[in-house]
């Protein structure tokens, strides 16, 4: 595995890390401030730059709970040649793949040559660094969905990922703010999905012919009379799966102008891919990446401290 300026994963050599052992119950931000004698702003910068792992898991959460015996690693690398783009932030990179956090408003890959996309951003970034590679799309997020994505840097790795996706990617989760008060703490939604002639995906309890079976698991985190915060785990990865399935149970995602009910309190689709866990396609190493829940989602609820239950 390559060690370059953007790596923040568990394969860093010890010389490129400050390795710290947790001695008492605390939070990650407070631990960094005290253990490394950092200012609060400097500690936040390091976390935001994806330079910290807890027990080999990348995290950016200020309030990540820490327990005695856990190991925190802080990268000594000062990131250079950093990608500066409002839509794409590199979370992890090695010679085989790159993990990004995509913001809403940009395509994962272009449908036509002139469309701006995360793939184009990465290809331009590689070219500026004189890397002889391109970003190969192995899965997608909708334009208006934000969150974690992975791109292969070679045809070889892309093929491994595409042929073994469900064996390699073992935990992919989303957070969504949806309309209405959820009736259940959790459940599973199953149906057949198929596009109609207008390219709108519709759901059916039986295969309409040419449909694709889809399974979505959900867990309610917070609920009010107006909105609910829901964690979603995909067992299948179909086009528009989450959006259609939440519509199916009467709780469409807020800000969804295609499958929603018109409720758009923050001016965007309230769907974010916050967790991506997989086995490295070349080394087999367990790779774990998570982002905080979007703050604008949390502001819809009284308790704005809800975070991923890691």
Annotate each predicted stretch with a short phrase.
Residues 2-310:
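RNA pseudouridine synthases
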């Amino acid at each position: 595995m390559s060690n370059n300026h953007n790596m923040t994963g568990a394969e860093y050599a010890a010389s490129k890390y400050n390795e710290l052992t947790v001695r008492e119950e605390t939070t990650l931000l407070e631990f960094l401030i005290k253990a490394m004698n950092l200012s609060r702003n400097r500690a936040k910068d390091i976390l935001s730059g994806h330079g910290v792992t807890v027990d080999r898991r990348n995290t950016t959460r200020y309030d990540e709970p820490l327990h005695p015996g856990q190991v925190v690693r802080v990268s000594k690398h000062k990131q250079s040649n950093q990608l500066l783009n409002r839509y794409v932030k590199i979370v992890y990179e090695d010679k085989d793949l790159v993990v990004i956090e995509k913001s809403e408003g940009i395509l994962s890959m272009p449908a036509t040559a002139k469309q701006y996309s995360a793939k184009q951003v990465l290809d331009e970034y590689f070219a500026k660094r004189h890397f002889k590679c391109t970003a190969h799309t192995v899965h997608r997020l909708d334009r208006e969905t934000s969150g974690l994505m992975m791109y292969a840097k070679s045809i070889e790795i892309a093929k491994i990922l595409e042929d073994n996706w469900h064996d390699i990617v073992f935990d992919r989760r989303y957070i969504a703010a949806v309309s209405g008060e959820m009736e259940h703490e959790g459940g599973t939604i199953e149906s057949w999905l198929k596009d109609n002639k207008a390219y709108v995906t519709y759901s059916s309890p039986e295969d309409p012919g040419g449909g694709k079976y889809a399974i979505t698991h959900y867990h309610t985190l917070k609920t009010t009379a107006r909105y609910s915060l829901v964690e979603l785990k995909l067992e299948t990865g179909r086009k528009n799966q989450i959006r259609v399935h939440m519509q199916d149970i009467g709780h469409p995602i807020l800000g969804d102008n295609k499958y929603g009910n018109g409720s758009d309190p923050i001016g965007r689709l309230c769907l974010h891919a916050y967790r991506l866990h997989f086995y490295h396609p070349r080394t087999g190493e367990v790779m774990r990446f998570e982002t905080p829940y979007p703050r604008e989602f949390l502001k819809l609820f009284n308790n704005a401290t809800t975070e991923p239950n890691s």
